[in-house]
Amino acid sequence: MTKNINQPVAYPIFTFRWLAIHGLAIPTVFFLGGITAMQFIQR
């Protein structure tokens, strides 16, 4: 893994890992943002 740094063809990271991280991170950020917003709106 030391000499294959300059070869982006070996590991296309932006296929599964990008969809997995953004597919789970965006709903969780929206969910936590909704909870914190509701706590300020009620009172």
Swiss-Prot record:
SUPFAM superfamilies: Cytochrome b559 subunits. Its main location: plastid. With its partner (PsbE) binds heme. PSII binds additional chlorophylls, carotenoids and specific lipids. One of its GO terms (biological process) is photosynthetic electron transport chain. It holds the Pfam family Cytochrom_B559. InterPro entries: PSII_cyt_b559_bsu, PSII_cyt_b559_CS, PSII_cyt_b559_N. Its cofactor is heme b. It is a single-pass membrane protein. The chain crosses the membrane at residues 18-34. GO terms for molecular function: electron transfer activity; heme binding; iron ion binding. Heterodimer of an alpha subunit and a beta subunit. PSII is composed of 1 copy each of membrane proteins PsbA, PsbB, PsbC, PsbD, PsbE, PsbF, PsbH, PsbI, PsbJ, PsbK, PsbL, PsbM, PsbT, PsbX, PsbY, PsbZ, Psb30/Ycf12, at least 3 peripheral proteins of the oxygen-evolving complex and a large number of cofactors. It forms dimeric complexes. This b-type cytochrome is tightly associated with the reaction center of photosystem II (PSII). PSII is a light-driven water:plastoquinone oxidoreductase that uses light energy to abstract electrons from H(2)O, generating O(2) and a proton gradient subsequently used for ATP formation. It consists of a core antenna complex that captures photons, and an electron transfer chain that converts photonic excitation into a charge separation. This is Cytochrome b559 subunit beta. The gene is psbF.
